Amino acid sequence: MAATKLDGKLYRDEIFADLEQRVAALKEKGVTPGLATVLVGDDPASHSYVRMKHKDCEQIGVNSIRKDLPADVSQEELNAVIDELNADDACTGYIVQLPLPKHLDENAVLERIDPDKDADGLHPVNLGKLVLNEPAPLPCTPNGAIHLLRRFDVELNGAKVVVIGRGVTVGRPIGLMLTRRSENSTVTLCHTGTKDLAAETKAADVIVAAAGVPHMITADMVKPGAAILDVGVSRGEDGKLKGDVHPDVWDVAGAVSPNPGGVGPLTRAFLVRNVVERAEKLLRA
């Protein structure tokens, strides 16, 4: 029997409807949230992601600001754009689209962002608050992934969750979020260097695949009935974008998020929600 499709688009629209009302209420009080994006280079996938984010803003009523920079931009020029957004009151929050070209220092860029304007929840201060379980903007993809599991009634309390990937955007933060008391999962963090990965995944109730290795999770690595989140994106040998989960997994798993269309729509929804929540916080202050 085919697995249940964990369709993020269903619940993205639910979140957007709530955000539209909240943005309208802010505008009645003279406040219009603004989301900015900083995009470096000509990667088609990154351009597509950014375009969708600005389309989301238009739908919800959030102002959007685009900063598109050439692939050969210098660190100093990129720093100047970040400083400009930090000082711009029209920009409630912003993201720097990752990954950046290799000549740029990604960590230095993330550290330069004003932590209060960090819409992606990836500033070291905000990741540190996540470790300490203090309020801060949460990383959008892990937040979307957990929301998707909850909305489809996937049990997290006491569940054995295997996370594959150690990146700052998904792998590391989702492990922290899943071990909060509100989720209460037992997490094993694996990666491309893990020995006998299949032994880990076969024992998992939930698998979060975020390594960026095409079709690395196959049916023989999955416990029947397990829930699988396909978060990784990479290009196969044919040049096409692929997820980390092989299509044959759908015949074994109980639930699978498609890629695209699973976690991605909720990532975008929580990005905008982080910006709207900051606008509400500023108004209360």
Curated annotation (Swiss-Prot):
The keyword NAD does not apply. NADP(+) binds at G165, R166, G167, T192, V233. Keywords: Amino-acid biosynthesis, Histidine biosynthesis, Hydrolase, Methionine biosynthesis, Multifunctional enzyme, NADP, One-carbon metabolism, Oxidoreductase, Purine biosynthesis. It catalyses: (6R)-5,10-methylene-5,6,7,8-tetrahydrofolate + NADP(+) = (6R)-5,10-methenyltetrahydrofolate + NADPH; (6R)-5,10-methenyltetrahydrofolate + H2O = (6R)-10-formyltetrahydrofolate + H(+). Its EC number is 1.5.1.5, 3.5.4.9. GO terms for molecular function: methenyltetrahydrofolate cyclohydrolase activity; methylenetetrahydrofolate dehydrogenase (NADP+) activity. The keyword Mitochondrion does not apply. Pathway: One-carbon metabolism; tetrahydrofolate interconversion. GO terms for biological process: L-histidine biosynthetic process; methionine biosynthetic process; purine nucleotide biosynthetic process; tetrahydrofolate interconversion. Homodimer. NCBIfam families: PRK14193.1 (NF010789). Belongs to the tetrahydrofolate dehydrogenase/cyclohydrolase family. This is Bifunctional protein FolD. The lineage of its organism: Bacteria, Bacillati, Actinomycetota, Actinomycetes, Mycobacteriales.
